[in-house]
Amino acid sequence: MISRQRRLLLAGTAAAALTPRIVLAQANPGVTATELKIGTTTSLSGPVSALGTINKAQGAYFKMVNDQGGVGGRKINYLILDDGFNPAKTLEQTRRLVEEEEVAFLFSQLGTGPNSAIVKYVNDKGVPHLFLSVNGDKWGDYKTYPWTLPFAPSARTEGQIFIKYALQQNPKAKIGILYQNDDLGRDFVAGAKDVLGAQYDTVVKAASYEVTDPTVDSQLIQLQSWGADVLISGVTGKFGAMSIRKVSELGWKPQHFITSGAASVSSTINPAGPERAVGLITSVYMKDVTDPAWENDAGVKAYRAFMAKYFADGNPNEFYNAYGYMTGMVMHRVLEQCKGDFSRKSIMAQANNLKDLENPLLLPGIKVNTSPTDHRPLEQMQLQRWNGKQWERFGAVIQGAAV
C-alpha cells in the first residue's frame, strides 16, 4: 500500500509538472487553460454597417471550430466591438480590447481610416494585428508595421496584374490611368511603375480626380486625345459607372480594365448599361459562390453547409460572408501551427509562416504566402471579362510583380 507521505509526494510532483503550463497561460494575454480570447472592431452601425457581416461570419466559423474541440485544447472567444466606422471610436474600442479585455491578438479589423487610427498603437504594444479587411498597399509595409498583416490583394497588386496582361497582349501599348487622388488610386499608379520601371514616363499618362468631382469626363477625353489604347480605371463607386458610360459615348475602344472594387454588377455595370461594358476586364481571387460553375464544388458546398448550420441568419450568397468564412479558416490554420503556444510572439511568427496555403474558396492556383519580409498574403489574381450578361473568367492566374 502506498503510504500517505508517498501519496503527498506524488501529488506534489504532479502539481509541479502542471505549474509551467498554468503560469505560461496566465503570462500570455488572452490565454487561459481553456480559452483563447481574441478581438476585433468593425461597423455594426453607421454608413458601412453591412460590412459587419464579415466578422459575424468569422464568429460563426469559430463557433464551428469550438464545437469540433477548439484549437490547442482551448475554445476561441471572439469579441466583436462596434466602432461605427469612426476612427476615434476604433482607437477607443481597440484600447479596451488590448488593455481591459487583454485579447491575445486583433483579427480582421475593418477599414483604412479605422486601422490607420490604431496601427501605431498596436505595433508599439506588440499586438498581432492580423488579416485586416482593407485593400491599401501600405499595410504590407513589414518594416514600418511588423505586427500588421492585411489579407486581400492590394490595389497595387491589381494594377501590376493589369499592366502585365496589357503588355502581354500589346508590348507597345500606350496606357492611360484614371485614378482617384487618394491612397487607393495612387496604389494603381505605383503598380504600373513597379512593372514598367524607367519606361513608365514614356508609355503611361495618368489623370486624377477628386471624390468631390461631379464627373470624370474631362480626364477621359484627355486620355483618349493622348492616344491611350489601354485604359485602367482605378476608381471607386459611381466613378466606375461614369467611366464606362463616357468611354462608350466617346466611341473609344481601349482595352479597358477596372478595379475589382468597382466591378459590382448592381452598383457599376447596371447603372452604366450592361451593353456599354462588354469587353470590360477586372480581376478576381475568390470563387463566386453564386456562380453555377461552382455549384458542385466541394469547397462551396462545405461553405453553404456551414452557413445553414452556423449562420442561418446570414445570406449564403453574400460575398462578405464567404470572405469571412475564408479568412476565419486562414486564421484557424495560423492557430493550429502555433501548436498550443499562444504567446503574441508565437502567433505573429506563425502568421508570418504560411507557405503555399490553399483555401477551398480561393480560385484554383491562388495560394496564401507570408514571411517576416512578405506581408502581402495574396499576390495572385485571375482576370474576368464582362460578356454583356455576366463576368467570365479567362486565362491563367497572374502573379503580381515583386516589390
Question: Where in the sequence are the language-model features?
Answer:
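Extracellular/periplasmic periplasmic-binding protein-like sensory domains
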Residues: 247-323, 397-401
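Extracytoplasmic "Venus flytrap"
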Residues: 30-31, 39-59, 81-88, 110-111, ...
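Extracellular/periplasmic Venus flytrap/periplasmic-binding protein
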Residues: 88-92, 137-141, 146-251, 293-298
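Venus flytrap/periplasmic-binding-protein-like
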Residues: 83, 130, 136-140, 211-212, ...
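Beta-alpha junction/loop-to-helix N-cap segments that form part of ligand/metal-binding clefts
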Residues: 50-56, 68-141, 151, 209-216, ...
